[in-house]
Amino acid sequence: RFITNKSSGKQGYEIAKSLSKKGFDTTLISGPTNLEIDDDINLIKVETAEEMFLATQKNLPADVAIFSAAVADFKLKKKYQNKIKKQDMLNLNLEKNVDILNYVSNHNSMRPSLVIGFAAETDNHDKNAEEKLNKKNCDWIISNDVTNKNIGFNSDFNEVTIHYKNKKINNEKLSYKKKSEISDEIVDRVIDQLN
């Protein structure tokens, strides 16, 4: 038994495919999923936020880092080796996981040229995404509305807004379409930014 969310990883896998298709040497650090990826993509499978953090550290430096995974903010303070038996009441103590996006975007010596985070929002989408953009010190935040059942978690479709730190560029809404198409549009903008 474990604490998780409904994220499928589909958007991250599609972004990795788009990057590879456009000629990027691509590493995908993936949490548990049954999704498949092309052989030319370096796939690193992890099960915990801590494993994802360590794998990320090992794969720096990079030109671009895109953080689309819905990594758990908290973990159990104490891990249980055996099944916890049913009881009337159970209190679980949690502690914070390392904030991987924050770590990478503030890493002085190995910070990628472009750091992109994702924000799964339920309300105040633009305000929350802008706050995350500034708080985490990333270059872009890509937000979506996870209360909309037609997009986001487990869907093959998405609709996102790209929030840019560089305010000379207007924030952009990428309208409802397949996650593969959203990924292609994101990667096209990555290429434009790097050139």
Indicate residue ranges for each PLM-predicted region.
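Short, small-residue-rich loop/turn micro-motifs
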Residues: 30, 70, 164-166
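Hydrophobic/aromatic residues located in beta-strands of well-ordered beta-sheets
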Residues: 26, 65, 115-116
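Glycine-rich phosphate/nucleotide-binding loop
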Residues: 18, 76-180, 185-195
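A glycine- and small/hydrophobic-rich beta-loop-beta segment
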Residues: 32, 36, 40-102, 106
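Glycine-rich phosphate/diphosphate-binding loop of Rossmann-like nucleotide-binding domains
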Residues: 1-48
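Glycine-centered flexibility sites
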Residues: 8-12, 31, 72, 117, ...
